[in-house]
């Protein structure tokens, strides 16, 4: 029971045991996790852009680097999705608590009005006490109902966070952290002495809106006083705010107890300036006002002073690990430690940046010294800030890298031309002043600057990110660009055309990659538990969509975008992956079971290509072939044997038989997905045949031909084995 009860003398008795505090922590968690999700999205987009720029490279090193960037992008996208789930469920918790407070306020207002009317009426005190207790009992019952509903919503929100992050049971976790899920104890009935004392004394400190009332004789107990503990807003058991709440810290004020009931009253809001102790990184936070979502509270200010692991540092360490050859991007190892650990692991304090030596420049006399005001040509340009080398990260074991010098040391200024001395030059002599050649700039080292070993799977630090194949093609252009050999106009035009073609190819590949990803996400949202892949074939003219269910068969309930092609029915290898089924492609995208899926956007393709995509070689005598295949397949339900004849001969199928056939199809559908990827091919064949029968009932001859052709191909695959 919080200290901000609804107004009214009897509010504590009416709704006090169910009254929660304001959901400030969940509301702060909504904003915090939403911003964290956006940061992770931006980092994933940055990695996607870098991967698109590197797509022009060839070779094992380039493929390995692209794979690492892709894994990092998927990991960041998963973390962003988890942050969004935490934000949404924190908002659900806050809404549940706010709704509970509103309903309890209405119940308290109605109960106070009824009790005041009872007390203002005429009659013996015993009758008034009985009527007041009846109103309190009725209000307690309504408060118990709305409190149970709010608790159920909070538990559901907590469970959703567990399902998307670390797994576990919300009920067990809440009980382990001291939250009582039982019905709170109701206050004891009011006596005549209690009513007399409350009506006679109405000071400001009473839980009914007055001063502390004198406790009745029935509440006085003997024995040493026990230390009060804060209670759960939905129960009487003590509520553990964090796993470190019993450790050393500032002492808390004693908790005042209610004169009615057994539940102690927690103190009111803390005084201004009070800083709550920070929660440990691994302990989920329980917000005030009900059990909140794990880790949904915003990190306290005390924890922010320890330089938490920010998305910028994660992205920088990941990129540094890629370019310096550290295996598997050692700077991003915090990502693989779990979503909670990656979001809260602190970094060591940064080292002070090194001082940059100042370079003195010779003083040149200007017109200002002669009394003429000097007007600069442009605004003064600020000097570039010194680049601080990254410090050693103890948590991620990242090797420090010395800053690279983009240019050589500054050339010494040329001395001014000396005044002519001696006789004037003869007629026709060279009047140009002598030119002092500046010292040659030492070449910039191209090898690894730090002491980190350069693995064969990553480019050397400071070196080019282009593969050897691309470097060979651009080597003549680099050689011709040297000052010693003048560049012919034709060679310059050729180099410019080559550069433009490479940039255009990279942009085209990036656009196609995004288009394939949108197609893949649109289809995978309907069955996220399957593996999907999409790619471009025939020099970018055909968009192929595949899944490894029965070596390429697309289930009937999957709606397809327009302008895509599916695999033709044919016997194929049993355990072929989606990559194997896709074959040779120019650009491809893949979805793994229960992987990250982006939210629909305005560019999401419309699902209008079902009948145009599901095509297969025409089967002669489709109806008789389907009837014969169904009869030979004895594992089908009996309803299929009865319906297939009526469907092929257009006799008409009753609605109850159609519904029963759909029900059997759904059961087989669930059985296949439960055992996927180790599904039984015979069960999938049953699904194909039922899909063909349903297509005939719906008048889709092309769809029935497609599903029957796949069933025949799957049966041939079983026999060949």
UniProtKB/Swiss-Prot annotation:
Q: Name one GO biological process term.
A: symbiont-mediated perturbation of host innate immune response
* Position of the signal peptide: none
Q: What InterPro entries does UniProt report for this protein, alphabetically?
A: DUF5631, DUF5632
Where are the compositionally biased (Polar residues) regions? 470-484
Region Disordered: what ranges? 196-291, 370-513
**Source domain of life:** Bacteria
**For bias kind Low complexity, which ranges apply?**
202-224, 232-250, 419-429, 491-505
Stored Pfam families: DUF5631, DUF5632
Give start-end positions of Pro residues composition bias.
264-283, 379-389, 435-446
The chain's disulfide connectivity reads none
The identity of this protein, by name, is: Uncharacterized protein Rv2082
Q: Which organism is this protein's natural source?
A: Mycobacterium tuberculosis (strain ATCC 25618 / H37Rv)
